[in-house]
Amino acid sequence: MVYYTRKSPRIPMYDYSSCNYYFITICTHNKLCLFGSPDHLSEFGQIAKAHLEQLSSHYDGISVDKYVVMPNHIHMILILPSGNQYDLNQIIGQYKSGVTRMIRNIQSGTEAVWQRSYHDHIIRNQKDYEMIWLYIHSNPANWKKDCFCNDPLTGSAL
């Protein structure tokens, strides 16, 4: 049997604990719409949102600058301070684990909640930051055009 090594989407040799602004996207497993609609989050969506809002209290100096919980994914701008002792993989991994644990407490038998890994982009300058901030801000309005939106009139994912 042949086993393949999955290529890491991270930049080789980059220190992901370094002081920077990061644009993060985390998708649900198979892009299932678990989190409700953008304007009315489900119970699972509320859990995902609450955990995002608590990140800064779990990690000293880390902050979530802008975020949106969408039906099947989450976008955020995560700011890591200088002298930070956690790397991005630890933070995102623990976030995903915490949300999964809470969801399984509500609905036992729930298997995978999240897609493997996550997407990241290192924000390079003010223009990059502004474009990403606007993208996150506009994401709920653009949901009705998404191929995973079942009802373009209401934006419902269910």
Predicted feature descriptions by range:
Residues 1-158:
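Short catalytic/metal-binding and nucleic-acid-binding patches
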